[in-house]
Curated annotation (Swiss-Prot):
A zinc finger (C2H2-type) spans 179-201, 207-229, 250-272, 278-300. It is found in: Nucleus. It comes from Homo sapiens. Residues 101-171, 220-243, 305-327 are annotated as: Disordered. The gene is ZNF444. Its main location: nucleus. The keyword Transport does not apply. This is Zinc finger protein 444.
């Protein structure tokens, strides 16, 4: 006498033998060597993605859908996978049906559960498995939520005393263990980050330099500071250290200013005497330095060029007269 196989078991058998499950359950022990293992894995992947039938966009959608489902919480992932979405848009539609609006009318962020959440996979157990449905994160033989089990799907509800959800994250992706700073309310997903943030409020500087005793809040700041001490591995070598100040042996007897070169001292002392030994041959104006009178004579040259179209020649037929010392 034949025993009829229930529809639920038949659907599970198809799912467990799907190309996606064969690809995910692959182990190196399934092949005699690494080269054979790579070839077998490549063949299993082709059986799942079927590049001869699907376009690149369709295969990419399968990979995106798998990663999207693996990022969901375990209970939500089990419920969405039991509906066998064929694309990311179908998975998003199921999540919107499950989680509903972001907040209920009374102001809380509780989410509603559709009527068929606890119906289990029997409602869709007769759906044919095409081998394209990646049940990401579900172990072989795992069943969906059992009928009548009220604990199968428990959507996350933020309690009034719980910290606020992480900004920028959807409600179903914010972990219930998210912590926030009691001082300013800043939310952190990692306790280590929160601990380091709270040190900024207390002013605590637990990391002290053994060389000079200066304290720092973060360890990397201390490491960077220790490199500035001479002899440390990160301190600059002799070639990178600033050179000592050079001696300036030539000093002015009037103001005490010192110079490296004697010529600079001689030129400086003329500023105290007020002497202007260089005169312009055009207007007779005197200057203390030769380069100043040369710069001044360019003004006369430009004026003459604009008035006559050429610069007035000097005594030898060349350019303007060079400056000569007065007296």
């Amino acid at each position: 006498m034949e025993v009829a196989v229930p529809v639920k078991q038949e659907a599970e058998g198809l799912a467990l033998d799907s190309p996606w499950h064969r690809f995910r359950r692959f182990h190196l022990g399934d092949a005699p060597g690494p080269r054979e293992a790579l070839g077998l894995l490549r063949a299993l992947c082709r059986d799942w993605l079927r590049p001869e039938v699907h376009t690149k966009e369709q295969m990419l959608e399968l990979l995106v859908l798998e990663q999207f489902l693996s990022a969901l919480p375990a209970d939500t992932q089990a419920w969405v996978c039991s509906r066998q979405p064929q694309s990311g848009e179908e998975a998003v539609a199921l999540l919107e049906e499950l989680w509903g609006p972001a907040a209920s009318p009374d102001g809380s962020s509780a989410t509603r559960v559709p009527q068929d959440v606890t119906q289990g996979p029997g409602a869709t157990g007769g759906k044919e498995d095409s081998g394209m449905i990646p049940l990401a994160g579900t172990a072989p033989g795992a069943e969906g939520p059992a009928p009548g089990d009220s604990q199968a799907v428990r959507p996350y509800k933020q309690e009034p005393s719980s910290p606020p959800l992480a900004p920028g994250l959807p409600a179903f992706l914010a972990a219930p263990g998210t912590t926030s700073c009691p001082e300013c309310g800043k939310t952190s997903l990692k306790p280590a980050h929160l601990l380091r943030h709270r040190q900024s409020h207390s002013g605590e500087k637990p990391h002290a330099c053994p060389e000079c005793g200066k304290a720092f809040r973060r360890k990397e700041h201390l490491r960077r500071h220790r490199d500035t001490h001479p002899g440390s591995p990160g301190s600059p070598g002799p070639a990178l250290r600033p050179l000592p100040a050079r001696e300036k042996p030539h000093a002015c007897c009037e103001c005490g200013k010192t110079f490296y070169w004697r010529e600079h001292l001689v030129r400086h002392r003329k500023t105290h005497s007020g002497a202007r030994p260089f005169a312009c041959w055009e207007c007779g104006k005197g200057f203390g330095r030769r380069e100043h009178v040369l710069r001044h004579q360019r003004i006369h040259g430009r004026a003459a060029a604009s008035a006559q179209g050429a610069v007035a020649p000097g005594p030898d037929g060349g350019g303007p007269f060079p400056p000569w010392p007065l007296g």
